[in-house]
Amino acid sequence: MQGEIQISKAVIESISKITLDEIEGIYKTNKIKTSGKLFSSVSEDLNDLNIDIFLTVKTGYKIKTITTLAQKQILSNIKSMTGLDADSINIYVDDIVEKQ
């Protein structure tokens, strides 16, 4: 069957945000930017997806552990929900708050 599926950047950003909300140690997601073609045909994958995520983390957590987990889980959730692969998921920790 021929056809095309287009997935909006808002969908990718929502999947990323929902995933991040489930990770312990992340205080809040400040900004998510996506770029690339969010397009897939039934017969071949033509996406070129890049995601930039800006986070605030809580003290007492290892930043490398949290961010690596976030990258893996976001990639997995995007792949399972949309069939798309991200070329890059860049995470920037731009603030830290005391754990409450």
Where do the model's predicted regions map?
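A short interface-forming secondary-structure element
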Residues: 51-68
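Short, highly charged C-terminal tails/helix-capping segments
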Residues: 88-100
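Short, non-transmembrane amphipathic alpha-helical segments
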Residues: 63-82
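N-terminal presequence-like segments and adjacent domain-start helices
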Residues: 1-12, 17
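Short edge beta-strands and adjacent turn/loop segments
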Residues: 23-56, 93-95
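Short beta-strands and strand-coil junctions in structured, solvent-facing domains, enriched
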Residues: 3, 60-63, 81, 98-100
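Generic non-transmembrane alpha-helical segments
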Residues: 15, 19-23, 73, 77
